[in-house]
Amino acid sequence: PFTADADTIVVNIGDMLQRLTNHVYPSTTHRVVNPPGEAARKPRYSTPFFLHPNPDFLIETLPGCISADNPNRYPTPITSHDYLLERLREIKLV
């Protein structure tokens, strides 16, 4: 569970950005659970924004995210289209 302070913006990182950053920014599993009791009556605003690169965009690990302590987990680049298909197959949507 995650508890945010007032006036906080929460950004959920997706799988593609995780790959691009070599897990420097890990992907999150997004789940919303209503708080119990009176806290459920407080306002909560959510604005989803999804960004997907052009199908031919080559996903290569960002050089600044590779180090001796964090070697490149993805030495072979992949297009965003192929990556999306790979992920959809993994979760059995294709």
Would you name each region that the model predicts?
Residues 1-94:
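C-terminal flanking tails of non-heme Fe-dependent oxygenases
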